[in-house]
Curated annotation (Swiss-Prot):
Name the UniProt record assigns to this protein: Sensitive to high expression protein 9 homolog, mitochondrial
Compartment list: Mitochondrion inner membrane
Coiled-coil zones: 177-275, 377-423
Keyword entries, A-Z: Coiled coil, Membrane, Mitochondrion, Mitochondrion inner membrane, Transit peptide, Transmembrane, Transmembrane helix
Phylogenetic placement of the source organism: Eukaryota, Fungi, Dikarya, Ascomycota, Saccharomycotina
Mitochondrial matrix side: 21-298, 579-580
Region (Disordered): 45-68, 86-134
Annotated GO CC locations: mitochondrial inner membrane
Spans traversing the lipid bilayer: 299-319, 558-578
Function: Required for the maintenance of the structure of the mitochondrial inner membrane. Involved in mitochondrial morphology. Causes growth arrest when highly overexpressed.
Subunit and interaction comment: Homooligomer.
Family matches, as InterPro entries: MDM33_fungi (IPR008839)
Species for this entry: Yarrowia lipolytica (strain CLIB 122 / E 150) (Yeast)
Gene name linked to the record: SHE9
Pfam family, one: She9_MDM33
Amino acid sequence: MLTRRMQCLRGAGVFRTVAALPLLAQRPNFYRPLTCSALRRNNDHSYRHESRKDKEMQDLKESRKMREQEALDDAAFRNTFEFAVEKTRDSDGKSPEPEVEIDVDREAQTPWDPVGSQSRHETRQEHRERFDDIKKTLPSSVHESQPQMYKWFGEKMDQIQAGALTAGQTLNEVTGYKAIEKLKLSIEKLEDEVLEARAEVREAKRMYSDAISERSNSQREVNELLQRKHNWTPADLERFTELYRNDHANEHSVNDAKKRLGECEHHVEDLTLQLSKQILTRYHEEQIWSDKIRRASTWGTWILMGFNVVLFIVVQLGLEPWKRRRLVGSFEDKVKESLQEWEARNEARRLEEATMAATATQAITELQRRIESPHVSKADVVEAEAEINSIKTNLATWFKEREEEEKEEIAKEAHELAVIAEDPDMTDVHHKPHPPQPVDTERVVRPHLVENFEHHVADPVHHPTLPITSTPVLEEDAPPPRIHPLVQMSPDSPDDGTKTFTATRDGYDVHPLVVRPTTPPHFMLQVWGAAKLSVESATNKTVAVVRSTFQTAEQRPFESTIVASLGGLCGGLVTFLYLR
């Protein structure tokens, strides 16, 4: 019976638990002998209690483990954050703050409490906000906040770089250098294989030498045992048997090592031969490629030289003549326009001077008629002569002022012509880009009627009653008569008063004009017309000379052009010889 009950107790697991004893001790009044069913119920209750306690312990361990992991994460985050803050302050030139030491074990062993977890959560949130503020100043954030134009420019530059790389690859494919690059990579790979094969050969030699040395040692030991065969012990017999049994294996190992060594050496020879062939092939292909590029470079040089020669011919035979023609034509137009303006002004001045001279002549004629009348008194004669002298003086003063004005205009027009000759494209010459040069205005003058005024008034043909000697010559030292700015008096004038005027233009003397002292005003008008014809003829001759010069320059290039042509041809020849 006792044995059976012990079996029941052992089967119920009473000996495995101790938790049910205090419960039984707390209820002494209800104590009764235990039966198998009661013990089974108590054991079930204790088992459930144990399971609940085990579950609580497991939950406690898991919560403690989670707290430890959170403490480790917080410590790592704080370390990272402090490091980032220190680096940022160092980069800004500020002094770093003192580091805070964190005891991870103490953080992990701290009992869990909701208040502490809330404070740590707030601290973690604050650290994350500060880290977000610092993250805004990082290069990646700055790049994201850059303007769209800057990003677009960066993308375009990347595309251009990629396009340049693609163009280089395309050029290599077109020229055939890509296959050479593949061959180069194959050679490099084969060199690595040769190095590995040589290492295998060295390893095979070592194994072969080890096998030979092991077999030699075994044979030496066998020979030693055979020499003392009559003194063998059981151990010597066993050793001899073992050595004799291993001799066959040693022989096989030596043969295998020798065979493997031969295979490795043969493999190295094959790889070396293949490497040599590929190196020779690469050298041959690179030579062919370099010859192709050199040939293309030669043709490109010839094409460039031909383009330069064609461009030189076009410039010298097309552009330069057109430029010279344009310069000459522009200068001709400016000169003709200036001459036309000059002639128009001279015509107006001539008419004005003729009108003034005619008016003065009429007035003086009336005064002379009054003097010649028989009923005039001596006082009236003196008054009339004084009035005549006054008219002559005023007329001379007026002509002198007009002459000064004309000299100034001549100097101005000469300066304009000089500017036009220097730069025919200059249209606004009144700004005077260059300082005016002194002009010889004494040689270039206009007609002056004051010198011949006495002869006009005292003409013996129209006034036979008035002797020539009775009229004084007011301007004996006046310059010789001048009809046109381009008309000057011949220095070989006779002493009888006859003057010869010649229209001069660029060294050409045309239409000599002979003027006598008694030339009437109406003949002076004919002289004016002849002078105009002389100037026009001189202008036409000047234009003819300019055109002849232009044609000569067009047919015969300048020496500098010839030198430049020879220099270009010599340079091209030297370049071609150098490339060849």
